Amino acid sequence: MSDYKSTLNLPETGFPMRGDLAKREPGMLARWTDDDLYGIIRAAKKGKKTFILHDGPPYANGSIHIGHSVNKILKDIIVKSKGLSGFDSPYVPGWDCHGLPIELKVEQEFGKPGEKFTAAEFRAKCREYAATQVDGQRKDFIRLGVLGDWSHPYLTMDFKTEANIIRALGRIIKNGHLHKGAKPVHWCVDCRSALAEAEVEYYDKTSPSIDVAFRAVDQDAVKAKFGLPGVSGPVSLVIWTTTPWTLPANRAISLAPDFDYALVQIDGQAVILAKDLVESVMQRIGAAEYTILGTVKGAELELLRFTHPFMGFDVPAILGDHVTLDAGTGAVHTAPGHGPDDYVIGQKYGLETANPVGPDGAYLPGTYPTLDGVNVFKANDIVIELLKEKGALLHVEKMQHSYPCCWRHKTPIIFRATPQWFVSMDKEGLRQQSLKEIKGVQWIPDWGQARIESMVANRPDWCISRQRTWGVPMSLFVHKETQELLPIERTLAAMEEVAKRVEVDGIQAWWDLDPKEILGEDADQYEKVPDTLDVWFDSGSTSYSVVDARPEFAGHAADMYLEGSDQHRGWFMSSLMISVAMKGKAPYRQVLTHGFTVDGQGRKMSKSIGNTVSPQDVMNKLGADILRLWVASTDYTGEMAVSDEILKRAADSYRRIRNTARFLLANLNGFNPATDMVKPEEMVVLDRWAVGCAKTAQQEILKAYEAYDFHEVVQRLMRFCSVEMGSFYLDIIKDRQYTAKADSVARRSCQTALYHIAEALVRWMAPIMSFTADEIWGYLPGEREKYVFTGEWYDGLFGLEENEEFNDAFWDDVRYIKDQVNKELENQKANGIKSNLEAKVTLKYADDANGTIKKLKLLGEEVRFIFITSQFVISEQAGGIDDENIQYNAGNTTVQAVVTRAEGDKCPRCWHYTTDVGKVAEHADICGRCVSNIAGNGEQRKFA
């Protein structure tokens, strides 16, 4: 027997079967860097319509975690897919570089400013630390395969950016949004600074819950309000609180104007409570016997005065809409210096905003003899003892509740009234304009709109001042005596002068500045404001300080912001406030949020649990493309589960896609698209169908990319590779591809289809599996640009027309029939027919309502190649098909497959069984078809 292996067109490619991504990817990255791939893309896209995804800056502190990876990969997928969609989509990564966490790290290593070195030296060390953190994170982000201007990122500590942050504040001042006030703000006693809303986390805390009686100053007046002048015993108004330490700052008691308040007789005294809460309060304080003497509306009690239990003054009853019946007594202890609602109502009534607590959380001297110098969280017991001594404590118990804590220290925080600078939400209509702008933004998922609308509608004024060392200075001057801001025009001119200096020397220029250099003779009357800006102002102003300033953005506003769902109250909020305050419009057109990562059991990632997944470990073991594929295949709108098992599944999916690509490349061996391409109208019908499959898949994949629906992209890609190609087309074409004449139309038609499919597939993969797409690109035949990322989606796809005889609907029926035939072939393995080519299939049918069988008959001899059997016979059953046999419906056609052993001998070249093996003397051991393909004109294929 001759060896016919040399006569076959066996697949061959240098594209490896195994990805070995962890080993190969670093080399590809080095090439990308050496070639300046990002610069090549920018040059290729110059002049195209822009799409700007503005990077929300991660904090320059610590190594990147899996959440960082999700965020950067999602951004990169969008930027690359937009590039392939014909956009110029520059990506400038950024970092948030000022603020407390960096200060704390530097303090831990070197000590606090003023102890061993000056504030200026401390800032220099903070800048140095932030720079090292940026370098570390940048390497990991690049390793993820994220393309961007990594050589020129934006840093909020860049001198020019610092200067522009000051200019942004100047514009906000010019537009009338800044004001100064002693308002209660979130205050961390460990940070000794105000905190932004986004820096507050909530944890369970056990606190004392107390009911306190404030005795009426004019007993008769109160009794008269209830129409009960003869009531015996003293009358008190009862408040309930879980923060006894705030009682020294009490300046009023708030009631709801429309609630009914009851005068209740207990144990020789009368107390006033909300009528609906009487029963629960009586149970709580253990009053078994009580009598409701009368009721009045809260409005009737307004401005009646009650004696503070131990502070030696009396306070008014006032009316407020913030009073509820959810808990307590219906009478709210009101300390304007310790709560935003209290402050607002206090302003309405002209109450003192008392602030008896220092920045360290201890009571200031002169507060109360037994409280002076005591930390507020240690003062609750002292206050409770005071109330007992004064006979004002009705009840005390322990209560667990959610309490605000510092995001950095995880310790409880307080509301503390301090002189601060605020961006007003209402003075110049910022709240209403922001709500209007929100409606013009596309929120993805759409529930993001309601979430941020609620936050904007209910948020207090934004406290933008901080008492920190490492931050952008507010750059303001105030009068030494009145503390009034320098007149507006001079303030703006002074800020611009400061900004110019900061642009040259950084923020230290402000602290080195002698006011005389700017204010001249007036310098003696004014002093510099020592405060720095909230770091959320730094990042929130980047639509101006970065997007408006970078030349590659060419004056275009950002199209998209993309961050985790916690940023509705963080970066999305601060960016919206600043942009609307400066320009009257939102800084973004689309806002996309992704969920947080959890483990395979849905638990939050935690080092203590030991369920964290390190992106560095994943890249070093599996490769970045596996991590990228996991991100893309996960629905980012909810929690994103990741574990070793989940990543293993992503690796399995990757292998299926890679194997498909390798099959395409291996079978394109020897194909030159410039000379070997077959025209569509001359191609085998099945090949045109396959290209049409790719066309349909591309339409759906591009639609999913456009909708940022990346898990749908992956699902559609997998279906194309595994089902449409792997389970059908690629199996069928192996015979033709391997056995036909090398340069025959039959084979070149197949290669033409594979070429079109590969050109499309590599581009679908590129935004997600970027390294693998780049690797595939290098093995594709034909002239092309150096990188897949510089081009656009493949536009060479075509398909079958609907009015053709063998259209897509026909091939859908064929695929269905083939699935059923394959099941019967599988069943026959038990009867000794081990492979499909050992089989002869007789397809019986009783009717052909939709014409599928008629069309199958028209395929003639080629029908067997579709079913990958040696013989295939179609037989009409006039009397119908026996119901006891296996039967099924293809469209409206009832058919049955009967499998028997194929007739004839096995051809050693094509492995088909035929009755003409050995009929040609020169080739005595192969079939007639193979003889034709070796020595004759070659077989002709029209359909399959």
Curated annotation (Swiss-Prot):
What CDD domains has UniProt attached to this entry? Anticodon_Ia_Ile_BEm (cd07960), IleRS_core (cd00818)
Q: Which GO terms describe its cellular component?
A: cytosol
What is its cofactor?
A: Zn(2+)
One Pfam family assigned to this protein is: tRNA-synt_1
Keywords tagged on the record:
Aminoacyl-tRNA synthetase, ATP-binding, Cytoplasm, Ligase, Metal-binding, Nucleotide-binding, Protein biosynthesis, Zinc
Molecular functions (GO terms): aminoacyl-tRNA deacylase activity; ATP binding; isoleucine-tRNA ligase activity; tRNA binding; zinc ion binding
The UniProt entry lists the main location of this chain as: cytoplasm
Lineage: superkingdom: Bacteria
Q: Where does L-isoleucyl-5'-AMP bind?
A: E563
The places in or outside the cell where this protein is found are: Cytoplasm
Q: What class of enzyme is it?
A: ligase
The record ties this protein, via PANTHER family, to: ISOLEUCINE--TRNA LIGASE, MITOCHONDRIAL, SOLEUCYL-TRNA SYNTHETASE
Q: What does this protein do?
A: Catalyzes the attachment of isoleucine to tRNA(Ile). As IleRS can inadvertently accommodate and process structurally similar amino acids such as valine, to avoid such errors it has two additional distinct tRNA(Ile)-dependent editing activities. One activity is designated as 'pretransfer' editing and involves the hydrolysis of activated Val-AMP. The other activity is designated 'posttransfer' editing and involves deacylation of mischarged Val-tRNA(Ile).
Subunit relationships: Monomer.
Name the record gives this protein: Isoleucine--tRNA ligase
